[in-house]
Amino acid sequence: MNTILFLIFSLVLVFGTVQSVYGHGLGSVESDILFFNDNFYKVKVQTTPDVLHGNESEIGFEISTINHDEDNVVSNIEYLIDIVNPENGESILSFNAYSPNESFTAKIVPKNIINFSGDKTNGAFWIGTDQNPLTIEAPLFMQGGLIQVNVEVLSINSKSLPRPPVFETLLTIGEYIPFEVTIDKKYDLMFATYFDKIDEFHYDENGKKLTANMPFNWDVDFIKKIPYVHAEYYIPKSMKVFNDHEIQMTVNDISILGTIDRSGDKEIVVHFLIPTKKLVKLYDEIPSDTHDKIIFGLESGKLRDVQKDNASLELGDKVIVLSTQEDWKFHLTLTPQGKIN
């Protein structure tokens, strides 16, 4: 009787579904669509750059009003712009603005004072164009985080609106923060935050866990206003406690899914992207004494499988093939052992 050979093809899904790597920060946001002046409109708020590296002398700031029906940007608009702390509702900067062109443009210089430098209309609106942007010194963008930009459209083409609409937007600016961890030697890591500053980094050598603490308001009404919380770790591959082991991601000690990208030559990038629904669910799960912060945790797990393409199937060994981001594993073995005739 011929020996019956079975080729067993084992597919191991490591991370829920295949996901692409997420980009850095928003830096750009569009409002909800509102109907006024016989058309549907939305407002776009944008900054340049979208991620801070700590050496920026000024930040580009641009506001555009888009006619959603005609899909074009509207010119000759007067605004009331109010930039607010989204957690407490306090106004940081408020001013009247005007652009004869398609977009209102300003340069914001991060300082602990408020000062405007530019031209005004006869109606005392600050003018900002691409060729001559308004310069504003203000306590804004001194670090990465979330700001609320409320844009009230007062007039279009010199015609005042009887009931000026207010567009509310939440704008996220990222920031790269370098830090060090010492285990057997000193390692240089990077953390990217797209929501708020980081109060503390800590590595627990006994538990082999890395954490970053970020202030956060877990009030459910506030959480429902934000689309998601985004953060990233950049870990050198020389750090074997994470490179040679599987990585478990946690938020306030609750295990969550995320993206772990090992495709780079020198570093591992771990992405936290927590949407609104997950944040609301986490509110009921996290320890009550952590309702004032988010703790982004990485735990070193079991030794991970590595690519193995020189195995002998006939001797009962297995071939292991990994996808680029290692979110899919393919294990190939023969049962029973022996040659394929």
Describe the function of each predicted region:
Residues 22-233, 237-341:
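N-terminal soluble domains immediately following signal/targeting peptides that reside
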Residues 1-7:
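Bacterial N-terminal signal peptides that target proteins for export
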Residues 1, 15, 331-333:
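A detector of low-complexity, intrinsically disordered, Ser/Thr/Gly/Pro/Ala-rich segments
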Residues 16-22:
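N-terminal signal peptide
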Residues 7-16:
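Bacterial N-terminal signal peptides
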